[in-house]
Amino acid sequence: MSATATLPETDAPTGDDAATPPGDDTSATAAASSPAPIKVRRMSFHPDDNIGRRHFADGDLVMSHVVSVLSGLFPEGEDYFVRSVRHFRDRIDDPVLKKQVAGFIGQEAIHGREHRDLNDHLSRMGYLSNVVDRFTKFSLGVDERLAPPHYRLAVTAALEHYTATLAEVLLGDDEAQAMFSEDEVRSLLMWHAIEESEHKA
């Protein structure tokens, strides 16, 4: 939906009035196109107390392992994204973009913390989340030693856009959400998806 208002038909403007076409509300359009703020929501989940069943994704063994592997990727991945963005933070002059970067870093830090807690619990249940976490840390460490900063920033932008797209699919699919019958897992993933959708390029 366009933010530009539809004005009633009038006689053709003359003089100074002709400079601004009817319906061309520049200020409204600018406001609509300005980036939304990235808000840091300080969440805290408690998987130890609230995940009972071993196959927590609606009793589905395969999907439960898929989620555990994805969760294992997140903490080190989020830290990598933060370092990639932070490297360029001091070069930013735009105050709006600076606020967005600060919000992005804050969100990613909390994502990593909450998924580490979930990974610890899933590992105690027999999942390989922490093994995936260690492998991810090693792999990204090699990447950071070999790849230049602008490449890492490009990777961050691409992966954030990809995960934001997946997040929007999850948020719009009631059937997919219903698979996470354990409330704590569903709440964590939905919160993460909502915030990831704010990072879309």
Residue ranges and their predicted role:
Residues 2-8, 16, 24-201:
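Non-heme di-metal
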